Structures are given as C-alpha cells and as structure tokens.
Amino acid sequence: MALSPMMTQYLETKKENPDCLLFYRLGDFYEMFFEDAKIVSQELELTLTGKDCGLEERAPMCGVPYHAVEGYLTRLVSKGYKVAIAEQMEDPKLAKGLVKREVVRIVTPGTITSESALSIDKNNYLMGIVYLFDRFGIATVDISTGDFYVTEVNETRELLDEVHRFAPAEIICNPSFSMSGIGDFGVTISSLDHQYFNEVE
C-alpha cells in the first residue's frame, strides 16, 4: 500500500520542518497527523482520532478550527514548542488535483504576536547571536513593537550582560557559538546553519 497524495505532501512538508509541530490547513481546520497529532492532542487535551492515509493503519489525527488557532498556538509555545503553519495556497475549488500548501509562518517564543500571549508591561525580544572572529554580534528585536537593537561585544561576560538586560524570549545563534551559561536564563535557544547568517569576509 502507498501513502495518499495528501499525506505524502504532509510528510514532505514535515520533513522540511522537523523541529516544529506542523499545523496543516485542511478547509476550516488545521490538522496534525502521526506523532505531532499525539503530542498536540495530549498537550491541548484534544480528541485523538484517525484518518485513512493509504497505509494499513489509520494515521493518528487531531485538529483545531482555523478561526481559533491563535489561542492554541499560544498554549503550545508557552510549553516550549515551535509550530509551523502550512496554508492552502490556492482555492480548493479551483485547484487541479492536490491543493498546493506551503509553510507561511513559524511560531516560536520570540516570534509570537498574539495579543493574548504578550504582556503590555514587557517586551517580547528575539535575540540573534553570531560568533565570528572572536567577537559576538548581537541583534535584538521585538517584532510586536518594531524595537530593534544591534551591538558587538568581545567578552562572554559582556554577552551575558546583554542577555540579562534584554531577557529575550528566544535566542537564535550560529553553530560556532557556545551556549555555555546562556541556559541559566531559562530562554529557548536554537542553533541555525551558517547559511542563515551574513558572514562578512
């Protein structure tokens, strides 16, 4: 037996976002399948059902209404998860064959914009740290307000001072960066490939 075209598309999209829970738009719902469905159903106390997927066993499945998705995203992000949102990129009524879908948004502690998830008394900073040529480049942004700061420091102590000053919700860094000491701040940390950082020769 072979996977259905829709489930093949789902798994290909999931493969491109392995560190995220995938919310896959199907009509008026975002659906989750397989392991993601098990995790989301448990974390959000949703009913876990199943869907025919072309295999002998049904794929575990759960879903949330698209119009209420922000509340569910807030709850998952507060538990430390990242969520990739795959939207329908064409009208299903006009699509020839399988509806095209693409990930249009990845929601993390530093990129969430839902008002219910943000505090009016505190910025929600996302901090990028790149370590090159024995220096730390630091960029800090609150995408909900547009506040943006950049600086460069030479010493780890100075870097930790910056992390303490901004208290970011999330830090992204290049692989050359050692995260020693940063974990003490209780912040979500992600290491991204060098290609995501503009390295000046």
Model regions and ranges:
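Basic, polar low-complexity surface loops/patches
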Residues: 1-201
